[in-house]
Amino acid sequence: MLVYLAEYLTQFYTGFNVFSYVTFRAILGLLTAMVFSLWWGPKMIERLQLLQIGQVVRNEGPESHFAKRGTPTMGGLLILAGVFISVLLWGDLGSRYVWVMLFVLGAFGLIGFIDDYRKVVRKDTKGLIARWKYILQSLAALAIAFYLYASAGSEGETQLVLPFFKDVMPQLGAFFILLAYFTIVGSSNAVNLTDGLDGLAIMPTVMVAAAFALIAYLSGHVQFANYLHIPYLPGSGELVIVCTAIVGAGLGFLWFNTYPAQVFMGDVGSLSLGAALGTIAVLVRQEILLVIMGGVFVMETVSVILQVGSYKLRGQRIFRMAPIHHHYELKGWPEPRVIVRFWIISLFLVLLGLATLKLR
């Protein structure tokens, strides 16, 4: 929004031209989202406590989690508010990339809100029925996938980028829709599964978003894109604003979500942030890179699939409890140790993913 005001004011003072630079607006976007989260966080936590919107803890969960019962949840609203305000202020509202991301965050945030509302307000421990949650996620993801395919303006927007391969970028055609759908829905649910310990999901989300900010910037510059053999995507630089807003809002939220957490993000946060990461990966044509950089999310999801599959087929469990972070808790690891080690793994995988841009 302020881009247009700065463009108008440039005729009176050329210094306002600095707002035309994505990097400058990205920094302001990060700071805006972070300051908003830090400023509004205590007020929101107090409000959630007054409304008695507290975390529901399953009786079959680890005993150490019983103390978390009643901790304010739905803190993802704080993250979403910070991201929306930041992007609307510093993003180019004429960019389809910006509106796609706002739609995804809003749609999946609404799904998560309904789920959280049923759990904490209506005291339904199951929340939104899994079937309906999946249907709503699918409708939102398919809407985005069809739109992106129909509005693609270049071949690069529907190519598949393979890490480690320089000149292998097959054209997906209509299969783009299928890949986009599974990437968005899968990423949304993967982050949701990871969000089981204090700060466990938000920090890897911040790391992956920061990495995608760099990739989006490189993809939006023809020289960098050609040098790295990745698709040149005109206008994708505006995704940098969205990514840095997620980083800023996420770090601000982590201030209150770090162990012992004062607030949890809830499904309103985890489903929307996961979908956002998946959508960004689709937009910059780096779905496979998301699997690498978001390896912690993949690990958590695979542990659940293996656990359920093993129990149904063999009647035996592989892990003491799934997702896998609970397995390590039940092995006796203190919660902070599990969290920080998963963060370290995430940092390693993000750096590995970025390295693949050059290892071709």
Curated annotation (Swiss-Prot):
GO molecular function, one term: phospho-N-acetylmuramoyl-pentapeptide-transferase activity
Reactions catalysed according to its record: UDP-N-acetyl-alpha-D-muramoyl-L-alanyl-gamma-D-glutamyl-meso-2,6-diaminopimeloyl-D-alanyl-D-alanine + di-trans,octa-cis-undecaprenyl phosphate = di-trans,octa-cis-undecaprenyl diphospho-N-acetyl-alpha-D-muramoyl-L-alanyl-D-glutamyl-meso-2,6-diaminopimeloyl-D-alanyl-D-alanine + UMP
Cofactors demanded by this protein: Mg(2+)
EC assignment: 2.7.8.13
PROSITE patterns registered for this protein in UniProt: MRAY_1, MRAY_2
Location in the cell: Cell inner membrane
Keyword DNA-binding set for record: no
Topology in membrane: Multi-pass membrane protein
Recorded superkingdom: Bacteria
Involved pathway(s): Cell wall biogenesis; peptidoglycan biosynthesis
Pfam family, one: MraY_sig1
Transmembrane regions listed in the UniProt entry: 21-41, 74-94, 97-117, 134-154, 168-188, 199-219, 236-256, 263-283, 288-308, 338-358
A GO cellular component entry from the record: plasma membrane
Keywords, alphabetical: Cell cycle, Cell division, Cell inner membrane, Cell membrane, Cell shape, Cell wall biogenesis/degradation, Magnesium, Membrane, Metal-binding, Peptidoglycan synthesis, Transferase, Transmembrane, Transmembrane helix
GO biological process, one term: peptidoglycan biosynthetic process
Similarity annotation: Belongs to the glycosyltransferase 4 family. MraY subfamily.
Function: Catalyzes the initial step of the lipid cycle reactions in the biosynthesis of the cell wall peptidoglycan: transfers peptidoglycan precursor phospho-MurNAc-pentapeptide from UDP-MurNAc-pentapeptide onto the lipid carrier undecaprenyl phosphate, yielding undecaprenyl-pyrophosphoryl-MurNAc-pentapeptide, known as lipid I.
Name under which the protein is recorded: Phospho-N-acetylmuramoyl-pentapeptide-transferase
The encoding gene: mraY
